[in-house]
Design a protein with these regions (language model features):
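C-terminal, non-catalytic "cap/extension" segments appended to globular domains
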Residues: 61, 65-197
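Long, amphipathic alpha-helical stalk/connector segments used for oligomerization, subunit docking
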Residues: 4-112
Length: 197
């Protein structure tokens, strides 16, 4: 939520831009806030998941999920993972993986047995878009960001999400916070609105 929906928003970039110019005058002398907004929201396939944009990020997750599912089902051998990975990056992202460091070995998850974790990253983005939409129903979240009213956003999360911890399931929390189960349409609307697609 904070990293993508807030920190990559036009309003947040405009808010911090004077500080960037103040504390890094040489680096930002001839830069406009619009340029920074486009830089942090530029859509381009990358090899590294953690360096990817909000849209193609989910292809990275999908590839890892497919591999894990195939490994668990026995339909993919460990010796075939590299080729499957490389073929998937070509198929989904149009990228030829140059080496394992930018490919199959870039994440630490599998080395410590972290199987099944990757989809939670995408789920987080999907929930965040729904929460953003829900907050925006009663408050102008863009105005809140412009005016540094982050405590109000934190309070909404504390009241509707964080206070429950593991007392409720994700779906129960989503239902109580937004009156519906997880709705991928919220993420789609968020992406379409932000990137004008």
């Amino acid at each position: 939520f904070w990293e993508n929906n807030i920190a990559r928003s036009r309003e947040f970039i405009d808010l911090i831009f004077p500080l960037l110019k103040k504390y890094f005058p040489a680096q930002f002398r001839s830069v406009q806030s619009e340029t920074i907004f486009h830089e942090v929201n530029f859509i381009e396939p990358t090899f590294i998941r953690t360096e990817s944009d909000e849209l193609t990020y989910h292809y990275h997750i999908m590839i890892r999920y497919e591999i894990e599912k195939l490994l668990i089902s026995g339909d993919l051998n460990v010796s075939e993972v590299r080729d499957y990975w490389n073929d998937s990056y070509k198929k989904y992202l149009g990228l030829e993986v140059p080496n394992d460091a930018k490919g199959v070995l870039q994440d630490v998850h599998w080395s410590f047995g972290g199987i099944g974790y990757f989809p939670t990253y995408s789920l987080g983005s999907f929930y965040a878009a729904q929460w953003y939409e829900e907050i925006n129903k009663t408050q102008d979240i863009s105005e809140m960001i412009r005016n540094s009213r982050f405590e109000e956003i934190n309070q909404w999360h504390a009241k509707h999400i964080h206070q429950f911890g593991r007392l409720k399931t994700s779906d129960e929390i989503c239902q109580s916070a937004t009156n519906r189960s997880l709705d991928f349409g919220c993420f789609e609307r968020y992406i379409r609105g932000k990137f004008n697609i």
